């Protein structure tokens, strides 16, 4: 089984998270996507909703979307959400499956600042989402890593057993949506129907989340 993993604060989860994940799932023919809210993001100091509320929003999204599942192992951890620790744990939970950790190009460029980043490749493949026609600058620190580990999507159909350590790039449609933007709209009394799944908007309104 090929399993995609998309982590994030998801405060709240929105189409800017979901649509790229769906495109990656289709492009790489993944069997499912794990949506994984983190508990204590290493690069963020606070959230605007509780861990329980974010878990519930993601759980409801997964109920609405076939092939999506909630993964709560980071949310239940009382320590920073270091990706290498999470992937090691997931590789033990799914020993016979192939893991694909999904990230944006902006995160990939900063990958060398991540905790034990080189060990990520011991447990999973990386999927780097990029806008069509966009390429990593030749002088980028991560260009060598990308060149050395880059694999074509066609190679997936050739492999008969799980692999890790590769980097796949997937062109995705631009998504000019952010959680900050959505929270600001809600605080001003605007209803961002075009950016949230109906089930998420309904939950936010019932819980009075993000309203000032």
Swiss-Prot record:
InterPro entries: Cyt_trans-like, NadD/NMNAT, Rossmann-like_a/b/a_fold. Its EC number is 2.7.7.18. GO terms for molecular function: ATP binding; nicotinate-nucleotide adenylyltransferase activity. Pfam families: CTP_transf_like. It catalyses: nicotinate beta-D-ribonucleotide + ATP + H(+) = deamido-NAD(+) + diphosphate. Pathway: Cofactor biosynthesis; NAD(+) biosynthesis; deamido-NAD(+) from nicotinate D-ribonucleotide: step 1/1. Gene3D superfamilies: HUPs (3.40.50.620). It is an enzyme of class 2 (transferase). One of its GO terms (biological process) is NAD biosynthetic process. Keywords: ATP-binding, NAD, Nucleotide-binding, Nucleotidyltransferase, Pyridine nucleotide biosynthesis, Transferase. PANTHER family: NICOTINATE-NUCLEOTIDE ADENYLYLTRANSFERASE-RELATED, PHOSPHOPANTETHEINE ADENYLYLTRANSFERASE. Belongs to the NadD family. Catalyzes the reversible adenylation of nicotinate mononucleotide (NaMN) to nicotinic acid adenine dinucleotide (NaAD). This is Probable nicotinate-nucleotide adenylyltransferase.
């Amino acid at each position: 089984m090929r399993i995609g993993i998309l982590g994030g604060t998801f405060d709240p989860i929105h189409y800017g998270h979901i649509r790229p994940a769906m495109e990656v799932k289709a492009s790489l023919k993944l069997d499912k996507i794990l949506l994984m809210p983190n508990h204590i993001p290493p690069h963020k100091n606070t959230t605007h909703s509780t861990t329980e509320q974010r878990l519930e929003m993601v759980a409801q999204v997964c109920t609405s979307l076939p092939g999506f599942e909630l993964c709560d192992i980071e949310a239940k951890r009382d320590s920073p959400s270091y990706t290498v620790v999470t992937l090691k744990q997931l590789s033990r939970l799914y020993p016979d499956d192939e893991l694909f950790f999904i990230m944006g190009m902006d995160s990939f460029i900063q990958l060398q600042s991540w905790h034990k980043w080189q060990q990520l490749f011991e447990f999973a493949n990386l999927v780097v989402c990029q806008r069509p026609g966009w390429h990593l600058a030749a002088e980028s620190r991560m260009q060598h890593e990308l060149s050395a580990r880059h694999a074509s999507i066609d190679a997936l159909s050739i492999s008969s057993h799980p692999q890790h350590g590769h980097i796949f790039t997937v062109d995705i449609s631009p998504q000019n949506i952010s959680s900050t933007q959505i929270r600001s709209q809600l605080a001003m009394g605007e209803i961002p129907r075009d950016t949230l799944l109906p089930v998420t908007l309904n939950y936010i309104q019932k819980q009075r989340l993000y309203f000032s």
